[in-house]
């Protein structure tokens, strides 16, 4: 999602693979996977981000998510 990151691609890919492996292990369908990822994002925001910054960080996160989607263009 991020264009630039202080984290290496290797670190990100390794953690992402491990998280996807857990979802695959439990045969989580798309709706459950999205619910879990959403709950993780909510927990991180509530526990790790100062209250006065949560809304703006959540909005930036939502914008980054939308911009990273593969959405077919319709004419």
From Swiss-Prot:
Concerning SUPFAM superfamilies, the annotation shows: YejL-like
Q: InterPro entries per the record?
A: UPF0352, YejL_sf
Q: Which residues form the signal peptide?
A: none
NCBIfam families per the record?
PRK13689.1
Q: What's this protein's family per the entry?
A: Belongs to the UPF0352 family.
Identify this protein by name: UPF0352 protein VSAL_I1058
Q: Which organism encodes this protein?
A: Aliivibrio salmonicida (strain LFI1238) (Vibrio salmonicida (strain LFI1238))
């Amino acid at each position: 999602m991020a264009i630039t990151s202080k984290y290496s691609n290797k670190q990100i890919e390794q953690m992402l693979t491990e998280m996807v492996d857990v979802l695959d292990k439990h045969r989580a369908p798309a709706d459950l996977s999205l619910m879990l990822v959403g709950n993780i994002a909510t927990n991180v925001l509530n526990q790790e981000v100062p209250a006065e910054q949560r809304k703006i960080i959540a909005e930036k996160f939502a914008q980054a998510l939308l911009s990273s989607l593969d959405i077919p263009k319709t004419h």
